[in-house]
């Protein structure tokens, strides 16, 4: 680690490069930090919305010997993987849904990652709302379900794409409004109130 920051041969600021695209980037400089850093990396990568983490092992950490102490990460101060629910926002969303004349539910992979397929089915059936799925959300709702209108987006079905521009309330569940789904944001669902879970 004595050469870090000296522009040494093949030195790359991997942490600096990857911070904008990873949930957490960290450089391990001592072998004794490997166990807790790996535990923290797995915790962060798999909590909230899953995403990549980066661990950069300095040469010291690779060659030093240390006693391995298994560790488990269950909490990180100031890290909030899932924000608290705002009760007023939930009430406002429920009112929009209850008063909607032409609602549409957009289903993404987050439903599957959260193992919420059954809750989704109950929700759309109880409210009698049609649903369209993103490519990665296709298996969240059976294709033969009467409220499943098919895949959304530029490679999707005509029906749900037309419905996004006719609905009065758009409920997005477990999806991120990727450009493959929305296309031109200037014209996408401008008439709708949007609820994003």
Range-by-range predicted roles:
Residues 1-197:
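N-terminal alpha/beta PP-like core and its mobile active-site loop of ThDP/TPP-dependent enzymes
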């Amino acid at each position: 680690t004595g050469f870090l920051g000296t522009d040494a041969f093949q030195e790359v600021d991997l942490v600096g490069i990857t911070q904008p695209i990873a949930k957490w980037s960290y450089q391990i400089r001592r072998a004794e930090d490997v166990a807790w850093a790996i535990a923290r990396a797995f915790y962060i990568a798999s909590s909230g919305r899953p995403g990549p983490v980066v661990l950069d092992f300095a040469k010291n950490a690779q060659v030093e010997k240390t006693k391995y102490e298994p560790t488990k990460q269950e909490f990180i101060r100031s890290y909030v993987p899932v924000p608290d629910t705002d009760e007023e926002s939930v009430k406002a969303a429920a009112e929009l849904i209850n008063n909607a004349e032409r609602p549409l539910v957009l289903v993404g992979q987050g439903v599957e990652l959260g193992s919420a397929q059954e809750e989704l089915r109950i929700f759309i059936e109880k409210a009698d709302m049609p649903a369209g799925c993103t490519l990665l959300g296709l298996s969240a709702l059976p294709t033969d379900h009467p409220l499943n209108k098919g895949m959304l987006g530029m490679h999707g079905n005509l029906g749900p794409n037309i419905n996004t521009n006719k609905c009065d309330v758009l409920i997005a569940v477990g999806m991120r409004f990727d450009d493959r789904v929305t296309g031109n944001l200037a014209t996408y669902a401008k008439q709708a109130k949007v609820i994003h879970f």
